[in-house]
Regions:
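Secretory pathway targeting signatures of secreted, lumenal, and periplasmic proteins
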Residues: 53-108
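Post-signal peptide N-terminal segment of mature Sec-exported envelope proteins
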Residues: 31-52
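Solvent-exposed, polar/charged alpha-helical surfaces in well-ordered, non-transmembrane soluble domains
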Residues: 57, 61, 108, 112, ...
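Bacterial N-terminal signal peptides that target proteins for export
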Residues: 1-12
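Short, well-structured beta-strand
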Residues: 29, 122-199
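C-terminal motif of bacterial Sec signal peptides marking the signal peptidase cleavage site
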Residues: 19-22
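Bacterial signal peptide processing site
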Residues: 24-27
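Short secondary-structure junctions
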Residues: 61-70, 115-128
Length: 199
């Protein structure tokens, strides 16, 4: 019977031990806490909307004003689009022409559009505000996985009906969009507070 030299046995044992140690340190598959992408938001700076419409307001310098190109759009409907944030504030305006029936229809439509979100909303909070320009506005904050998180409308009940609603062109969950929602909401309040009718 042949015996291996003692040194060779020791080397074999060391290699066997190292291999076993390497196998025993399996990767850790512990779930990591949920994280969100970092979003750097610019400071709030504003510019006035041009005088091509029967209203004016201040909007963010980070946004572009685009005409609404949908087939239902009226001439003074706009989109205030934030390209870096994939956010869009849809603006609809209707001259109610001292027409009580048209005014009532616009009020009903505004409530229906907000109400459509009840299926996914965990809460819809309505506040009535008075702007520095003396306008009364209904403001809606929606929570949950809703397509529109913030909306408002204001009217003088005789001629002007103005509505704005925030939408995102992304499938990202609203909880991860929270800083961006707050950022654009701040801009929308500035829009509302600076809103004036000019025709």
């Amino acid at each position: 019977m042949l015996l291996a030299p003692l040194g060779l046995v020791r080397v074999g044992m060391v290699l066997l031990g190292a291999g076993a140690a390497a196998c025993s340190s399996a990767p850790d598959f512990t779930p990591k806490p949920k994280g969100y992408n970092r979003i750097d938001l610019p400071p709030h700076r504003y510019r006035p909307l041009g005088a091509n419409h029967p209203y004016t307001f201040q909007y963010s310098q980070e946004a572009k004003v685009l005409r609404d190109s949908s087939y239902l759009a009226q001439p003074d409907w706009l989109n205030v689009y934030y390209p870096k944030l994939h956010a869009n504030v849809q603006i609809t305006y209707t001259n109610v022409l001292r027409n009580r029936q048209l005014y009532n229809k616009m009020m009903e439509d505004a409530r229906k559009l907000t109400g459509k979100h009840q299926i996914k909303a965990t809460s819809i909070e309505e506040k009535i505000l008075r702007t520095p320009n003396g306008m009364r506005a209904s403001v809606f904050e929606l929570e949950g996985e809703v397509p529109s998180q913030f909306q408002f409308y204001t009217t003088d009940s005789t001629k002007h009906f103005f509505r704005a609603a925030l939408y995102f062109r992304t499938a990202t969950a609203n909880d991860s969009l929270a800083p961006v929602i707050e950022y654009v909401k701040y801009d929308m309040i500035q829009m509302l507070n600076s809103l004036k009718y000019i025709k």
